[in-house]
Amino acid sequence: MADKSFTFSAENLLDTEPEPFTKLDSLNSRSVWFVTCDHASNLVPKHMNNLGITSTEMNRHIGWDIGALGVAKELSKILDARLISGNYSRLIVDLNRPTSSPTFIPKTADGTPIPANINISEKEKKERTIFFHKEYHLNIEKWLDRLILEGVIPVIIAIHSFTPVFQNFRRPWHIGLLYEHDQRFVLPLRNELLLRNSNLII
C-alpha cells in the first residue's frame, strides 16, 4: 500500500490549490482550433508531499513539459482557439496516457524512482484517475461534440515539449510533429516551418 503521506484525497486540497484543469473558451464560437496542454504544470497537492521526490527532480522534465503552457497560451491567443490545460504534475497521473498504460502512474521517470507510485493501491489509483484524468478528458469530449454538432470540424493541437536527452539518447530534432492518420494539417505545417528555416530537423 502507498505511504499514507502520499495518499490523494480531494477533501484535503487547500482552498488555494487549483481545480484539476483550466479551460479557456474562444471568443469565436465557430473557431476550428482546439489546443490542449496535458503536461502544463508540475504542481502536486501539498498533502501528497511532492510524491516523495525532491523539488529539483520535480522541476525537471519528468514532472512536466517545460515551457509548454506558455507556448499553448500564446498559440491559443494567436488562433483565437479554445485551450484546456492540466494543473498538476504528470507524475500523479499522465493525462497523455490511457489508464491501462504502465506509465499512466509511473513508478520511475527517466531513472528517478517515484516513491508515491511504487506500491500504489487500486483505491488510490481510482481516486487519482477520477479526479485528475476522467473529468479532463470528458470536458475535451464535450467541447469537441459541441463543435461537431454545430458543423465545425475541429483541428486539435496538443502542445508538448521534450528534453534534448532522454535515457542517455541525444535527440536530434528541433521540433516533433506527431499525427495518426490525417495529414491535412501536419504536412503543410511542416512545409511552412522548413520554408522559414531550412536548417530545422523535424
Predicted segment positions?
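N-terminal catalytic or cofactor-binding beta/alpha core of small enzyme domains
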Residues: 2-156, 161-202
